[in-house]
Structures are given as structure tokens and as C-alpha cells.
Amino acid sequence: MKKLIAMLLAMVMVLGLAACGGNNAPAETTAPEAQAPAETQAPAETQAAAPAGEGRVYYLNFKPEADAAMQELAALYTEQTGVPVKVVTAASGTYSDTLTAEMAKSEAPTIYNIGNLSGLKDWDEYALDLTGTPLAGELTTNDFNLYNEAGELKAIGHCYESFGIITNKALLEKAGHSVDEIKDFASLKAVADDIHANAATLGFDAFSSSGLDGSSSWRFSGHLANMPLFYEFRDDSVTEQPAEIKGTYMDNFRQIWDLYITDTSADAKTLSTATNDESKAMFTEGKAVFYQNGTWEYAGLIDAGMKPEDLTMLPIYCGVEGEEKAALCSGTENCWAVNSQVSEADQKASLDFLYWLVTDEVAAQKMVDTLGALPFKAAPASSNVFLADGSKMIEDGKYVVSWAFNHTPNVDAWRATVVTALTAYSADPSDANWAEVEKAFVDGWAYEYNMANG
């Protein structure tokens, strides 16, 4: 695990991805967009409630998969301290809009997430300088944090994650194959093609649904799109957000997308309404061998009845030369900021709550079980199989595929354009429609950069 952390830090410094991703929360998978954010006021009534503490905590959570854990921890903290803690989780894909709306209220969030350096520019004056705080003192590294131009610590990176192709080893072996066969795109395709060709006999297919609705599209407009971005940026030594991109590896993007939408039981013509929950269900119910997602899904897969020994995560292969030496796509977009505009009592209460989350034995264990690896001194080791897979790849000398999508300008708008083009292409996979995907990808980047920077 230490080797994984060290390699991630090296990649962060080399590629300038010094912290979190875009304002759009890629892992958001709960609460339909039409509904208001899910809200819980902690705690529930208890027989021996602590005296009311000073200040209040309002945590605007951007990771729906962590909502249940955060609600539980909020209630526990209030029970122990008397400090009221409210956790609100934004609807899928709406974190940026929700944050803007909530910040305008009289009782604004006291803790919130800043996505990346671009997001920090938007929220700098609302973010307390965390330099010298006890929370900052618990960090094992500062390289995932966000600093403004004055060098002030404005957001603390509190976990790091990886994504790739989650694989059901038991089903793979039932189909007559093994993980060891898959070393690059060609071998992945050979295995997937064989499974798909025999799906009727096997009772399962290769890939789960590549849904393009709001709960799922980030997996492809963000995470899968990271592949062509990463390799282009690596070739061109890109270390900051470029004004334009070339689309050097768009053919590779097309190869892996074609595989996803072909070797599956999902109808490519209806992906615009296919959800992440449906895709996950296909995987947990044994209807698909492969499911593209990240380390954050581990706890949910186990809760759904899957066995740790049956799970592994493969790198995303797309046919790039030398990709057999690739590890998982790893980085972070989880950075805590404390609202500088609320009262000092609320600021202190919020900092105390965050400190408790990463130092209390019970809370820290719950955080690790939910989020994965945490860069704090008291954080226990994670039992997450996918993080162990990532560590093993680093130990074997493979290179980390860093989160190049952190550089995306106007991330929500750019991704939306890419999703629209991918949806049309999936329904009719012609060269003409793929040209529209490339246009959305390349021309859309330049357009959004100009919109963001003038």
C-alpha cells in the first residue's frame, strides 16, 4: 500500500494533478436528479444524549455511496459531543449546482468538497486556510491537498481511489478463462468475444451495461475518456490544463467503447436511459463478468453478497503500445474545505468533526471501510481487494495511469457534449457518428476552455 501511495504522489507531481477532480462528482450514483438532496439531522433520539455542544456542522457530501456511512458517523458524533451534525448528499451529477445553491443560504454548508484547482479559483474566498490545523497535522502527505496562489492550504485531500475493470473471477473461470490471460486490449477482447459468443450457454455475458444516463455516464465521459487524455498528455508532457487537445488516441477510445457496447446483453440503442444501478446489478447478480468502476464500489459489492476472493480489478486496456505495463487509473478528487464565511464556532466545530473522523478508532475504521485508503496517521489498513490489486501492480513495476481528466475545462459541459455524441454513436456506430464523438471531444475541449478562460 505504501508503494501505491508513493507512486501516486510521484504521478501527481509529474503531471500536475495535485489534488481533486472536477466539480462533477464522478462517483455519484444515488438520489434522482429531480429530487432534493437527501438530508439527515443527527442524531436520532438517544437515552443518554450529550449536552449540546458549541457550533454546528453542515457537511455537504458529494459521494452518495458514502451517504449511509456519513449519516451514521454524524449521529454517533452528535451522541458523543452534543454538536449537531447535518449531512446532505447531492443528487447524482449535481454537486456543483447544489453547492452553489446551498452556499447562498443563511445556514450554508460548513464543510464541502472542492474538486480541483479550477474549483479552488471559484471557492477560494469561501475556503478557510487550514494550514497548521490539527487536521492538517494528521496527514501523512501534503501532495493531495489544494493550495491557492498565496500558498494557503485551502482543501485537504482525504482519500485516494483507483478505477478499472472490476472482474468476477469465478464467472471468468466458469467461462474457461483466467485473469492471467488478460494482459492488453487484444487479450481482453479475445476473452470478452468468447464469453459473448457463448452467453446463451453460459447464462451470463462479458460486460455489464455501459449506461449513459446521469447516474452512469461519468464512468465513460470522465473515467474511460481518461485513457486517451492520459496517453496524449504523457506523450506531450502536459503538466497543466491545455487550451486544446489533439485527440491522438481517439481510435483507442473507440476500440474499448465498441467492445463495451458489443460484448454485452445490454441494448446499445437504449443506453441513454440505462443507469449505473442497473449495470451494477448485472454484475452483482452474476449476469456479467466485467464492470467498469472504482475502488469505491468495493463495500457495495460485498454488501450485495459478492465474495472478496471472487473479485479483482484489471487495468483499462485500449490498444496502446506498452499497455501491458499499465496499472490502475489512480488519483483523488476528494478534498475537504471548511467554509470561511461561517462563524468561528461553526468553523471550530467542523474542524473538530473532521479531526474526529480520521483519528477516532471507530470513525476512522468506518471511513476506511467506506472510502478505501486514507492518508492520515491513525487510519487503519484497508481490506479493499481492489486497492491491494493496485499495490501489487506497483510492486510489479507497472506504471500508474493518473487522472488526466482533472484538467478538463468546464467539466460538466464538456462531458455532457461527449455523452450526447456517444449516445448517438452507440445507437448507430458509423464512422460519421464517431466523427461527431471526436468533434465533441477535441473541438469541445477548446470551446469549453475558451468559455472558462475568455
Task: Outline where the language-model segments fall.
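Extracytoplasmic/periplasmic solute-binding protein
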Residues: K154-H158, F163, K189-P242, A288
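Conserved C-terminal helix/tail region of periplasmic/extracytoplasmic solute-binding proteins
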Residues: E173, A197, V362, E395-G454
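Extracytoplasmic "Venus flytrap"/periplasmic binding protein-like
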Residues: L76-T141, K154, A170-G176, K183, ...
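Glycine-centered hinge/linker elements that transmit conformational signals in sensory
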Residues: A192-D193, V238-T273
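Extracytoplasmic/periplasmic substrate-recognition and gating elements
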Residues: A75, Q80, K105, A175, ...
